[in-house]
Amino acid sequence: MTVETPPIPDDATPMMAQYLAIKRAHPDCLLFYRMGDFYELFFDDAVKASAALDIALTKRGKHAGEDIAMCGVPVRAYEAYLAKLVRSGFKVAIGEQMEDPAEAKKRGSKSVVARDVVRVITAGTLTEDTLLDARSHNYLAAVAEAQGTLGLAWVDVSTGDFAMQAIAPKTLAAALARLSPGELLVSDRLLGAADFFDVWADWKNVLSPLPTARFDSENSRRRLEALYGVGALDGFGAFSRAELAAGGALVDYVELTQKGKLPRLSLPKRLAEGAVMEIDAATRRNLELAETLSGERRGSLLATIDRTVTGAGARLLAAQLAAPLTDPHAIEWRLDMVGFFVEHESVRAQLRETLKRCPDVERALSRLSLGRGGPRDLANVRDALAEIPALRMLVTQSHLDTPPGINQCARELGEHSALVDRLQRALAPDLPLNARDGGFIAQGYHEGLDELKGLKTESNGLMMRLEKRYQDETGIASLKIRHNNIIGHHIEVPSKQADRLGEGYIHRQTMANAARYTTTELIELAGKITGAADRALALEMELLADLIGEVTARAAEIALAAAALAGLDCASALGEMASSARWSRPRVDDSTAFDIRGARHPVVEAALEAARSGPFVANDCDLADSQRLWLVTGPNMAGKSTFLRQNAVIAILAQMGSFVPAESVHMGVVDRLFSRVGAADDLARGRSTFMVEMVETAAILNQAGPRALVILDEIGRGTATFDGLSIAWAVVEHLHEVNRCRALFATHYHELTRLTSRLAALSCHMMRVKEWQGDVVFLHEVGAGAADRSYGIHVARLAGLPPAVVGRAEEVLGILEKSDQASGMARLADDLPLFAALAKPRPAATALPQASPLEEALKAVNPDDLTARQALDLVYELKRLL
């Protein structure tokens, strides 16, 4: 978003000329121009910011004969405003004062305080806790092209997590969906490539185009080698030219926005092709993995399974859910860790209580390495590292059969007692929010600082005694010695009593109801106090820099410990989830099995428990080679969509290394997961609901292979009946004959069940129901066979359609079912009376007879307390009473 910068006229004031020069160097940013205690914005920046922030727009002077628009935000509260601007899509350049106004005056009375941009804040380069979600990664990603291949690189500036991946063009969209970057860097040339138009459209709100020259692979290679101090990157992985181009552009952009500074970046990890399950954006959305269809975290799969107690653990859990593994050995490694915490409940409980006392080391370390950290970040590092001995002892007890993953975490926690001891001695108990406020070094840590603080305290006592003497000498009891940043220490008296002051009182300022003075004695004492305070703060800042230097010198070890803390938190949280929700350990191998017994949908089950609506009805699913394609029929509201989703969700949970909501699971690795469930249009691209459905179905048919898992719900429903049936028919055949993948296909087209005679691996299954005296009971059970009815009219009745409409629908359905559809339609048009003619008078109410045993039994029942099974049993009991 580039904002036009006005030219610098010859008659511009020195301050405005400085502002325009800085703004010209950052045309794509809103410029926060520091003026004392405020950041001011001018011209179009002010107009845009005032609208986005809902703050007053004023004016200051003129430029080219026009008023200069202006708005501002206080420095002490700027982060809240900054967060709102970044969320609105703006980049913000922070223009700070680089010297004290007193220093500027030494160059001349008209000299302007030197200012420069110290940082450019973008959505992908945030580090402040107030601007970030503690439980989510904030990725900055870059895409580059070289030799016909694509490279994807991503970094979380707030944690230093850095990785690269070579990808095929057709998998770019899925890779970006996995990362969900806060900002995406793309070259001008790649941005204009027609092949990626739809991909960029999905991420248009976070795109940051860069000149193509920034993505030079050779320059990027040298840049990365220099960053890590190595002669070659081969030791980190066999990176392609495209990966290097993306990674180098990423690092350059971070350094550019941080004005020459870089956070501590981890050694670049290389994600191998096919290392994680590929899940496209539509599938993630349909399965509500990280957020619901309404965009909320609550109600998503992630929110349901997240039992972590640290921010880093929550971020790791989210990353594992977003990228399920495809290597059975790696999956077993994680499952062993989770299983350890399921088995050892006491260890799990104690470890989780200890982890709750561990602050976010990763983000504190990143801020410290950028020179943006403060005393509280040091305290966060200290407090987390202080818990390491207790954590290590918990998981390495001699009687425990500790798995390799837990042992590795215990080793990587490291030894930090000397650093913890120094930080505990150095930092004061109560730490200020900002280092510039001082008072963060503990008493007794540094003798020289203690002396300066003592002098300051002694001077403050002298100031109080001086105030008392002045009150006694003048007889003005309300006389006060005060201080502000403009005139420093001064004597303040009510205006009506100012004439009682003697000749030694020097006038400084007249207010509405008070007058301000000083004396030679006060000036001397104030100088001592100010000098002592300034020297104390300067020394504290030196000591702070030393402490930060010691921490950053051990950054690699501390980062390793932070990752181990996150790993323990994530594994123990999944163990907590498995234990409390009665989940079982899945068996994942290289076969094509998909045998799930007693499966439940974790989100729906949790919602039922919260509402006390009865237990979730578990179901089996076995997509063996002989029946790898299930055709699922049954009425609306019977649970088809939930059944489809729960099997996909269980596959994701199993491959992320979690226990699963089922009695048992044996499944072969799923390399790609596709879900076409639900209905939504895409008005921004001019796509109807049916068009979106067809686009997503096309992606499935073109990409699914033998190891894929596909779930499809009601394909073809958005068009004419015969068109929809024909499409669904052809899709089933293609899945069976060409894709040859494991698939669940839910449909209301009962005609598709005839395909079982021709397709050997097609198996029919249905959602079971019970009919009783014109009513329908949904059992939510899956059984073999095909449903012959959809009970849509029954659902319409439950939804509250007027009885006359329901009656009319039943009459129409009866005619259609008694004849072929074409002739039935003709009869409907010719023979049925119009809707209005169907209204019949209701019979008059009659007196009720004496209650029968049947009625007494009904009165004793509360339907809200019945499960589906209990309701069915009750129906049979009531029938016996007739």
Swiss-Prot record:
Molecular-function annotations in GO: ATP binding; ATP-dependent DNA damage sensor activity; damaged DNA binding; mismatched DNA binding
Protein name (Swiss-Prot/TrEMBL): DNA mismatch repair protein MutS
HAMAP family: MutS (MF_00096)
Species name: Paramagnetospirillum magneticum (strain ATCC 700264 / AMB-1)
GO cellular component, one term: cytosol
UniProt family annotation: Belongs to the DNA mismatch repair MutS family.
GO biological process: mismatch repair
DNA damage recorded as keyword: yes
